[in-house]
Amino acid sequence: FYTRIWETNGTTVTSQVVNMEMAAEYLNNHGIEKQWDEETCQNYGEYQSGNSYFQVWLEDADSIRVKLSVMDQYQIGGVAEWRLGLEEPMVWEVIAEYMSRN
């Protein structure tokens, strides 16, 4: 459970890994309103500062809920996450809700 804050400056693209809480704080601290991106099924935020353009696709309870529904749709037997401990508590509530139905 993690995401990246992407920075594009000219032709240079860099990123930093952040946990779910840090990503939400980043959006809040920079006055970025997240919007649902139908293509990626994730909340998304962006802003520009000087010559840099910043983008964040959020892995959060909303996106996890969609991923779990895809598991149902395609009868996928399980899911893996990159690293435990980077998630928000709400994610476990979404997973528990999914598990109680299946």
Cite the ranges covered by each PLM segment.
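Glycan-binding loop/region signatures in secreted carbohydrate-active enzymes
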Residues: F1-V70, M99-R101
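Conserved, mostly hydrophobic/aromatic
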Residues: M71, V79
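Conserved residues at the C-terminal ends of beta-strands
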Residues: W82
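Short acidic, glycine/proline-enriched helix-loop-strand junctions
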Residues: E88-N102
